[in-house]
Amino acid sequence: MRILFAAAECAPMIKVGGMGDVVGSLPPALKKLGHDVRLIIPGYGKLWTLMDIAPEPIFRSNTMGVDFSVFETKHPSNGLPIYLVGHPCFDSERIYGGEDEDWRFTFFASAVSEFAWNSWKPQVLHCHDWHTGMIPVWMHQDPEISTVFTIHNLKYQGPWRWKLDQITWCPWYMHGDHTMASAMLYADRVNAVSPTYSREIRTSEYGEKLEGLLNYISGKLRGILNGVDLDEWNPATDNSLPAKFSVDNISGRAINKRVLQERMGLEVNPDKYLMGMVGRLVDQKGIDLLLQVANRLLSYTDSQVVVLGTGDRYLESSLWQLAIEYPGRFSVFLTYDDALSRLIYGGADAFLMPSRFEPCGISQLLAMRYGAIPIVRKVGGLVDTVEPYNPMNETGSGFCFDRYEPIDFYTSLVRSWEEYRHQKSWKQLQLRAMSNKYSWDRSAKEYELMYKDVCGIKEPSPDAAEVEKFSYGQEADPSRKGKKIKL
């Protein structure tokens, strides 16, 4: 199949959130399945110095009364074709924000539609979040191009209909209060980035006032879990780590922990329980919960905490105040540093994700891959990826709590701190977490099935061996083979 990905981000060149990881990693996994996959993104200013781009455009056109050009280049990691929409509105290095954000991304969606109609015509046009939300609306009139719309974060919904009428052409048949709603209505298939999140957004608690619409379109809505690039994120080959390690020998983590403590200005002590946090410092990520329990946690335990990220100024200053109050035990780096994030994954004992909501989450997957035990709230993709630890039967890969309440989070933190003192069981917990492999290959097969479904391509009947596999590739119990179930 010919598949075109349209998005505002693509890792590693342009990455702000999880969407960049998906757009950067899912296409090569689909290519391995034999599909012709290409990407189209805005031609941001920084890309012209980062990438080798052909000087002459491959396509020129006009939309929304503005001329634009499309240039071709290659993805630096996997070599897939990437098309860049060139226009002065994308010349700055800014990705999001600004008074012209609604116009810029509506223009981008319109340019992508013109390109798909008149240049490289895909069978499936895969759109990501509100930035490309008008594409399914316009493609609704073209029976030769099917559209898939992926919801990465329902909270960001794009410009409202009254503003869209002012900046672009809205078809007579268009319904929906804003870009996100219209995209979900007119896309041939809609998916969220985890099965649990696809169910949660159909409720008033997580639906962002779109739960009625999402229940209305539930027949074409599904949840497909994100994955991790197991080659890029591999502690056995990661050159960012002072000491490499693997599930067969995790002794290198002790060296990484010492280096992390030194770099973050913490007391260098291998026996201290070190917790890490990497990500955007916003309410969604549960930073307010951490602020509410930090004083009690640091008073009751001998734990250490490191936080890496940027975001809300109030939350940044509050975290900085804790670092001043607890020198050597609480450290904050208000920036994003890829090498330091890998050191936190590979050196911290535990990883904090007390999210208010979490569509999927990549950080908990990376943490488990690197042996940092996740402490998460049971919400969204965290439910699908982190199995609660049960010391009685020695199962699970992390510590989980239900309610978005400080006492629940604090209880999980103390419970993990106490478990850390039992190093034998803690090491087994680490090994189980590191053995989880949420690769993009599994996710790509689920997306492939959705693409074939929307294009009307019938799948051959699976053989008996395939029927006996669980959805995540685990083999069925051999002792049950050949046994019949009595009805």
Curated annotation (Swiss-Prot):
Against SUPFAM superfamilies, the record matches this protein to: UDP-Glycosyltransferase/glycogen phosphorylase (SSF53756)
Q: Pfam families annotated for this entry?
A: Glyco_transf_5, Glycos_transf_1
Q: List the disulfide bonds.
A: none
The residues that the entry says bind ADP-alpha-D-glucose are K15
Sorted alphabetically, the keyword list is:
Glycogen biosynthesis, Glycosyltransferase, Transferase
EC numbers for this chain: 2.4.1.21
The metabolic or biological pathway listed in the UniProt record of this protein is:
Glycan biosynthesis; glycogen biosynthesis
Q: Which residues form a coiled coil?
A: none
Q: Name one GO molecular function term.
A: alpha-1,4-glucan glucosyltransferase (ADP-glucose donor) activity
Annotated stretches, region: Disordered: 468-487
Membrane-crossing ranges are: none
The catalysed reaction is: [(1->4)-alpha-D-glucosyl](n) + ADP-alpha-D-glucose = [(1->4)-alpha-D-glucosyl](n+1) + ADP + H(+)
Entry's CDD domains?
GT5_Glycogen_synthase_DULL1-like (cd03791)
Question: A single GO BP annotation from the record?
Answer: glycogen biosynthetic process
Biological role? Synthesizes alpha-1,4-glucan chains using ADP-glucose.
Hey, which family's this protein in? Belongs to the glycosyltransferase 1 family. Bacterial/plant glycogen synthase subfamily.
Q: What name appears for this protein in its UniProt entry?
A: Glycogen synthase
